C-alpha cells in the first residue's frame, strides 16, 4: 500500500504507511499537541479526532485556541446537557441541541416545565460528569441501526428527525457519552475534560419545529468557552448587558411597556415617545438633506399586489391577513410595493431619475412568539425606509452617497465601530443568475469606490436582491445589524414601474431599497442598551429637570421651565414636597443630563445651580448662560 502523505499548515509533511487518525498525527508531532487536540480539518472539512485519513491530505489540528474548537466545545456541551438531563429526568424526550452565538441550547420535551432549581441540578450533574474525565466515543452507524437505537430508548423526536432526512443518508454518527447516545454530524470533543468552562444561563419555552400549533418544548441555554478566563469575561459582559437591558431601563425610566394582549407590539409612554420623536426628526432631516420626498402609503393592500411583487410566494408565512367584502388584504410587511405605486402615478423621463422616496413606514410581520424579545424583536415596527428609482449607471453614486449618510448617522448616535457586509443570493429567490451577478457586482463596485473593506455572506440576501449590511459594535462589544442597501432589478418589472429612455423606449428602472436605522423600535432598544439609559443631552427624553428646595421658589422654578421650553428644550419641573437630596438622587437614577436646583439665593439672582447626572457641580449660572451651554452641547 502506498504511503499516505499528510501536509500540515506550515508546509511540512508527514508520511504514514496506513490510514491514520487525526489524533495519531497529533501524537506524532508531540504529546502536548495530542493532549490539546479537539478535532481536525482535513482538506477543509472538519472531522473528529478519531476519524481516519485514508489518502494524501492537508490537515490542520483544531484546538481550543481555534474558533472552530470553541464551537465544537459548545456543541459537545449540548450533548452533555442531554447526558445530565436523562440521568436526572429519565422520562423526558430529547429533541435537538445546536450551537448558537456564544453558546448552545437543547430542546427537550418534558411533561412539566423545568425550574431554576432544575437548571442548577442539571449544571451540577454536568460538572460531576466532566470530572469523570470520560472519552466521547463516535460510531458511524447504519441508518436502520440508528432508528433501532432510538426506538428502543423511546426517543420519538429523534425518530422524527431521522424520518425528515434525505434517503441518501444511509449512515450517521452516533456519539456516546457513557450510557447516553446522541446523533450528530459532529465533530465533537474526544473527552469531557475540554468542557470545564461552561455555564447554563436560562430556560425558556420553544415549539417543535418552531410552530406554535405544535407541542411546547423546554429549551435549556448555556455558554461554553476554551477556558475559565474566557468564561469569566463572558459572565462579566452578560452582567453588564443585564444592567443595560432595555426592558429594565424602559420600565425604570417609564419609556414603554409590552403586554400579553398585544404580543410583539409596543405601548409607548410620553417619555419614550419623546425619545422616538427625537430620532424620527433627526432621520427626517436626513431624508430632506439627501433629496428624498417623504411619502405615506396604506397599511393594508389587496393580496393581488403582493402576488405580483413576489412576496406571496416568498414571504407569506411572515404576513398578517384580513378580509373585507370578500376581498383578502395583507397588512404590509414591507414598504417597497407601496412606493412603486407612488412612482407609477405619472410618466417619468430618464432625465427625472434618480427619484427618491422615504417613509416612516409601519410594518407588521408574523414573528414566532418565542422569537419576540422586548422592543428588539417585535411584530409591529416602523422603518426609516427609502427607495431610489434610478438608472444602472447611477447605482454607484447612489450607494456611495447612502454609505456616507449612514456613517454620519451612526457617528451622531454614538457608534464608531462599524463592519460592512454584503449578503449574497439566497437559495429561494426571484430572477436569473445573470441578474444577480449584475446586482452583486454593483454593490461590490460601490463599496470599492468608498474605499472600505467588507465581508461577504453567501445565501443571506433578500429574495429580490443582494444587500449591503451595516453591523455596529456597542459599548460592551456586542454587534448589531442595522442599516441595509439593496439592489433590486426585479420588483420594478413585476409591478410595472417604467421610465422613458433617451430613445423614447419604456424601460424598468433599478430600485434601491435603503434603511439606515431599520426598525425604529429596535434601534431605540439598541440606543437604550448602548448608552445604558444615559443618553447624550440632545437625545435624552428629558434633558433638564428644574427642582425647588422649598415652596417659596415654586413660581420661579416654573418660569425657568417655561423659558427653557420656549427655547425648544425638553424640560420638567419637580415641585414635590420632598427633600432636595431625594430629588437629586431620583433624577440622577433617571439619567437626566442636567438638574437645576433653585433656592432663595438663585431665585433672588435670577440664576440656577447646575448639576450633571454624573454628580458634577457646575456651579451657579444665569438661565441664559445655561441655555448657551446646552445649545453649544447640542450643536457639537
Swiss-Prot record:
Binds 1 zinc ion per subunit. Residues 245-536 are annotated as: Catalytic. GO terms for biological process: threonyl-tRNA aminoacylation. One of its GO terms (cellular component) is cytosol. It catalyses: tRNA(Thr) + L-threonine + ATP = L-threonyl-tRNA(Thr) + AMP + diphosphate + H(+). Zn(2+) binds at residues 336, 387, 513. Its main location: cytoplasm. Its EC number is 6.1.1.3. Keywords: Aminoacyl-tRNA synthetase, ATP-binding, Cytoplasm, Ligase, Metal-binding, Nucleotide-binding, Protein biosynthesis, RNA-binding, tRNA-binding, Zinc. InterPro entries: aa-tRNA-synt_IIb (IPR002314), aa-tRNA-synth_II (IPR006195), aa-tRNA-synth_II/BPL/LPL (IPR045864), Anticodon-bd (IPR004154), Anticodon-bd_dom_sf (IPR036621), Beta-grasp_dom_sf (IPR012675), TGS (IPR004095), TGS-like (IPR012676). PANTHER family: THREONINE--TRNA LIGASE, CHLOROPLASTIC_MITOCHONDRIAL 2, THREONINE-TRNA LIGASE. Homodimer. Catalyzes the attachment of threonine to tRNA(Thr) in a two-step reaction: L-threonine is first activated by ATP to form Thr-AMP and then transferred to the acceptor end of tRNA(Thr). Also edits incorrectly charged L-seryl-tRNA(Thr). This is Threonine--tRNA ligase. It comes from Xanthomonas campestris pv. campestris (strain ATCC 33913 / DSM 3586 / NCPPB 528 / LMG 568 / P 25).
Amino acid at each position: 500500500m502506498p504511503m499516505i502523505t499528510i501536509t500540515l499548515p506550515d508546509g511540512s509533511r508527514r508520511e504514514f504507511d496506513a490510514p491514520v487518525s487525526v489524533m495519531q498525527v497529533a501524537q506524532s508531532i508531540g504529546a502536548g499537541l495530542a493532549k490539546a487536540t479537539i478535532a481536525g480539518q482535513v482538506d477543509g472539512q472538519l472531522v473528529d479526532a478519531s476519524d481516519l485519513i485514508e489518502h494524501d491530505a492537508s490537515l490542520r489540528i483544531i484546538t481550543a485556541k481555534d474558533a472552530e474548537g470553541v464551537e465544537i466545545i459548545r456543541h459537545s456541551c449540548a450533548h452533555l446537557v442531554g447526558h445530565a438531563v436523562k440521568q436526572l429526568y429519565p422520562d423526558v424526550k430529547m429533541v435537538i441541541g445546536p450551537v448558537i452565538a456564544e453558546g448552545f441550547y437543547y430542546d427537550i420535551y418534558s411533561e412539566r416545565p423545568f425550574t431554576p432549581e432544575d437548571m442548577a441540578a442539571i449544571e451540577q450533574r454536568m460538572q460531576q460528569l466532566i470530572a469523570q474525565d470520560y472519552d466521547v466515543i463516535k460510531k458511524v452507524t447504519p441508518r436502520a441501526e440508528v432508528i433501532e437505537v432510538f426506538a428502543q430508548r423511546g426517543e420519538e423526536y429523534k425518530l422524527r428527525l431521522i424520518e425528515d432526512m434525505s434517503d441518501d443518508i444511509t449512515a450517521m454518527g452516533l456519539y456516546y457519552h457513557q450510557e447516553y447516545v446522541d446523533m450528530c454530524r459532529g465533530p465533537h470533543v474526544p473527552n469531557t475534560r475540554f468542557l470545564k468552562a461552561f455555564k447554563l444561563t436560562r430556560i425558556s419555552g420553544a415549539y417543535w419545529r418552531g410552530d406554535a400549533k405544535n407541542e411546547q418544548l423546554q429549551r435549556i441555554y448555556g455558554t461554553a468557552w476554551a477556558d475559565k478566563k474566557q468564561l469569566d469575561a463572558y459572565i462579566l459582559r452578560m452582567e453588564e448587558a443585564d444592567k443595560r437591558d432595555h426592558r429594565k431601563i424602559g420600565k425604570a425610566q417609564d419609556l414603554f411597556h409590552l403586554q400579553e394582549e398585544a404580543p410583539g407590539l409596543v405601548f409607548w409612554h410620553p417619555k419614550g415617545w419623546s425619545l422616538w420623536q427625537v430620532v424620527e426628526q433627526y432621520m427626517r432631516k436626513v431624508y430632506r438633506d439627501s433629496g428624498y420626498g417623504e411619502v405615506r402609503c396604506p397599511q393594508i393592500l389587496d393580496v393581488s399586489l403582493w402576488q405580483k411583487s413576489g412576496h406571496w410566494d416568498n414571504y407569506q408565512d411572515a404576513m398578517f391577513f384580513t378580509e373585507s367584502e370578500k376581498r383578502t388584504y395583507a397588512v404590509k410587511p414591507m414598504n417597497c410595493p407601496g412606493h412603486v405605486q407612488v412612482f407609477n402615478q405619472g410618466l417619468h423621463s430618464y432625465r427625472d431619475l434618480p427619484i427618491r422616496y422615504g417613509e416612516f413606514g409601519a410594518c407588521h410581520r408574523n414573528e414566532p412568539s418565542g422569537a419576540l424579545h422586548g422592543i428588539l424583536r417585535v411584530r409591529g415596527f416602523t422603518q426609516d425606509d427609502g427607495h431610489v428609482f434610478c438608472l444602472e449607471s447611477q447605482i454607484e453614486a447612489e450607494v456611495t452617497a447612502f454609505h456616507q449618510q449612514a456613517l454620519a448617522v451612526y457617528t451622531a448616535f454614538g457608534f464608531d465601530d462599524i463592519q460592512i457586509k454584503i449578503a449574497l443570493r439566497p437559495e429561494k429567490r426571484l430572477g436569473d443568475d445573470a441578474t444577480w451577478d449584475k446586482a452583486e457586482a454593483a454593490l461590490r463596485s460601490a463599496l470599492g469606490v468608498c474605499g472600505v473593506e467588507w465581508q461577504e455572506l453567501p445565501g443571506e440576501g433578500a429574495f429580490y436582491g443582494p444587500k449591503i449590511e451595516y453591523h455596529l459594535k456597542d459599548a460592551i462589544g456586542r454587534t448589531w445589524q442595522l442599516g441595509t442597501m439593496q439592489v433590486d432589478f426585479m420588483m420594478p418589472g413585476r409591478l410595472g414601474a417604467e421610465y422613458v429612455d433617451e430613445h423614447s423606449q419604456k424601460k424598468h428602472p433599478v430600485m434601491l431599497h435603503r434603511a439606515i436605522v431599520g426598525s425604529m423600535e429596535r434601534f431605540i432598544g439598541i440606543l437604550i442598551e448602548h448608552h445604558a439609559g444615559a443618553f447624550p443631552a440632545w437625545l435624552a427624553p428629558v434633558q433638564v429637570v428644574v427642582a425647588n428646595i422649598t415652596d417659596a421658589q415654586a413660581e420661579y422654578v416654573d418660569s425657568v421651565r417655561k423659558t427653557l421650553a420656549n427655547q425648544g428644550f425638553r424640560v420638567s419641573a419637580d415641585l414635590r414636597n420632598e427633600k432636595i437630596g431625594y430629588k437629586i438622587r431620583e433624577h440622577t437614577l433617571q439619567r437626566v443630563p442636567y438638574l437645576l436646583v433653585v433656592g432663595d439665593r438663585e431665585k433672588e439672582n435670577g440664576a440656577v445651580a447646575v448639576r450633571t447626572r454624573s454628580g458634577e457641580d457646575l456651579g451657579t449660572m444665569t438661565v441664559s448662560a445655561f441655555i448657551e451651554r446646552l445649545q453649544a452641547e447640542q450643536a457639537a
